[in-house]
Amino acid sequence: MIVNASSESPRVQPQLYRTASISTIVQAEQQDRFLQLGELNDLVTFLNSGTKRLEIAEVLSKNADILVAKAADKIFVGGSAISYLERPQASFVEFDNISMTQKEMSGNVQVNLLSNTSSNVISNDTLPPGFKPINVVRYGSTRMKKSLRDLDWFLRYLTYAIIAGDPNILSVNIRGLKDLISNACSSAAATVALREMRKSAISIFDNDLSAQEIVQQYFNILITEFDSPSLTDKIRRRTSTDVQGLRLPQIYSKSGIPLQRFVMKTSLSNEEKSSVLKACYRQVFERDIAKAYNLSFVDLESQVKNGSLSIKEFIRRIGKSSVYRKQFYEPFVNSRVVELAFKHFLGRGLSSLEEFQKYFSILSLRGLNGLIDALINSLEYADYFAEETCPYLRGLSEEPLESRNWGVQFSLLNYSAPFRKVPQFITLFSDYKMSLPDQHPYGLGNDHLALQFGAIFPNSLTALSNKSAFFGRYTRRILLRQGPGIYSQISNPQARSKSIGSLGPKIFKLNSIDNTYFSDEVMSLPPDIEQIIKAIYLRVFGRFIYLEELSSVRKFESLFRSSKISVRDFIRNLVKSSVFRSLYWEPLYICKAIEYIHYRLLGRPSYGRQEINQYFDIVYREGYYKMIDYLLNSSEYIRSFGDNTVPYERYITSANMILKSNYSNFLYSTLKTKNSNSKKFIELSNILEKRSLNSIQARISQGVSTVRDQYKVFQLTQLSSQVDKRQVVKAIYRQIFERDLNSFAIGDEFINLEKALVNNNITVQQFIEQIGSSSLYGREFYQPYPNTKVIELGTKHFLGRAPNNQAEIRYYNQILASQGLSSFITVLVNSNEYNQVFGVNIVPYRRFTTLPAANFPNTEKLYNTLTKQSSEIIVPSFIVVPGNQ
């Protein structure tokens, strides 16, 4: 399945191999415990043997050439095999201060056919079937070089594994090479060479039995892995046609840190069963709630330990518990609830939009319990976890991941996922269907602004600022050019050198005759070479350089003043200087640095992926200086600026253009206001035109929407029917809880209060006071928020406005902190303001026209915030006056 778009790509470095220390520590970390005594002893043993392992690796490295030569002479005849080793891979270092026994092998590597034949007879190892000595001349020099290189690589991997203390690096890099070498020459010959290398390496440590055991152990593993067949890929088959079928090479799973599978068995001890239950808590609640909060499901745990309840049903029960509901359902919108549920119960993220729509509809129709049942009863859960296995995170190195949700998958599997309120997958899937934005191919945050450039991927917890970019190889970003459109270099490359005139930027050009410069646009500047030098510094560095920095580029400036180098060469030397590299190359990411240099030298941002990839290739292959030469020697630079023109801004992004335009307009309006005569305010306040009634009414509204006139007052009277009374009850729920009660509660918590209100036993005011003091209101609007936010929500629900000032917030905060929520609600409902505005039988509503002008913006912001979408405190912005603060 071809995917044309993918999510943002975080920096992921797969584990290349395992070491003894990392494997021990990670196992304890996965179980959320300290290292046990046996594990500590293993670490001590490994660390104590570190010096011995380093000595063994050092001796093997010093004798690498001879070991490779002995192995090559075993399988090659008719010439000197070692002469084809292009360069020695081992580094010979002089150890003056290290007292260790220097062991070296001696021998003549220039052997002949007779010695090779005798060595085959003397060898104790049985020759593998199909082995024949290889003639050097017939084999060819190219193949000989590759074969000697491969033998040296085998020895190098062996030393890596010895130092790491784990043969995993051999399994990852050697397994499967047999098929590859069989296609090139002979795998049997490679086996014979490795055996000879083992024999020679062991003979080095003739007086060190422990070193011989270590070398023989790792050589045996190397030969076994080489002779073993290659691993098959891990296939992830899918049951639906809307999701990808995936394939992962086994080396990724073998090199990575394996996740421990926690499987409940009746034969386990009580302690082992407890560890399985803790793993379930860590997977579902993302932490061990027994250790963190002293919470546990004692009855369910006892049933699991007794065998009457499976792990699958245990996961189902704790997922439906009030603890899970409070932590991962109530604080989030439904879209995010679905994403987190996939992480907790299936160990992965969403795969497609169709999958999201399916489970979102289940959550909407059947609630959280229905969603959990659908996930746990799915075929995928049964295939991966069955009845007794605790779910686990199926991330990198566990199984293949989809490319279209690569970035958000990693973000979801992080520990910080519950802190992100915004749904990521549905936002990403919706972006797939949108038109191409005018952005850089490397990310949304990569638009080349004057203050923001390069590969910048902002990581935000509140807003998805790192979205996908559907750019292919041949997609080009839209850039704006000052001046006529017919001068665009895309449609008219010959017009690159044409001056735009007064429509474009100021162009500084050196006159090669008298060593002065002229400006096409600004004729009042003096013909001083100092000006053009300053223009070059401003263009290259973006500022004037300091005196300390100037000392390192003074020699280039002197050459330029004496007309020994041109403007282009002067810029070349400046960009290659240590000052420029320390500012704009060494501390930045490569993409970010290339973007900046490209913009400074060519006067425009890069067009897209294809253009910037060629700079990547030059930097990695030939270095930084070659990339600078490539830019300054390019046909675009020569046609646009030549040798004696200072580069200038030729193209700009639309976002940067808008940014500069807004700032210019703001600056112009500010200066114009300052220069205006302030004494004319009386004259300017006179009305010159004749205004109609509609014009006056429009001015009175002051930009406020018509919503303030479109409200309905729900009032309970003696003549109200049963239907009207039910409408009043629903209006109260919508005002106090900001939504219908049935959307988040069972609906029968206040059945007795509703009957009393319908039977006229209590008033609307008393009914509101009772539901405001209920546990449901406390759970929704008191427990999740700080006191200041509770006060804001309380005035919104019961008085229809935001807090008037800080003094009012402090007053209610004292009541809330000392007497609790019930007293706070009682004070609000029984206040003079409530009685004057609403009385005893009117449902509170949003008060538009009666609000003071200073408090209107805060009330507007408070009411426009979606229900429970933000816990941000709306701080009133009042002028500090006595009594207000």
UniProtKB/Swiss-Prot annotation:
Superkingdom, taxonomy of origin: Eukaryota
One Pfam family it belongs to: Phycobilisome
Modifications made to the protein after synthesis: Contains one covalently linked bilin chromophore. This protein autochromophorylates (Potential).
Record-listed (2R,3E)-phycocyanobilin binding positions: 185
Alphabetical UniProt keywords: Antenna complex, Bile pigment, Chloroplast, Chromophore, Electron transport, Lyase, Membrane, Photosynthesis, Phycobilisome, Plastid, Repeat, Thylakoid, Transport
Membrane topology label: Peripheral membrane protein
Record-level Gene Ontology MF annotations: lyase activity
Primary residence: plastid
EC assignment: 4.-.-.-
Subcellular location: Plastid, Chloroplast thylakoid membrane
All copies of domain PBS-linker, residue ranges: 242-422, 498-680, 694-871
Gene Ontology CC terms, in alphabetical order: chloroplast thylakoid membrane; phycobilisome
Gene Ontology annotations of biological process type: photosynthesis
Role summary: This protein is postulated to act both as terminal energy acceptor and as a linker polypeptide that stabilizes the phycobilisome architecture. May have intrinsic bilin lyase activity.
Similarity comment: Belongs to the phycobilisome linker protein family.
PANTHER family the UniProt entry points to: PHYCOBILISOME 32.1 KDA LINKER POLYPEPTIDE, PHYCOCYANIN-ASSOCIATED, ROD 2-RELATED
Protein name: Phycobiliprotein ApcE
Species: Aglaothamnion neglectum (Red alga)
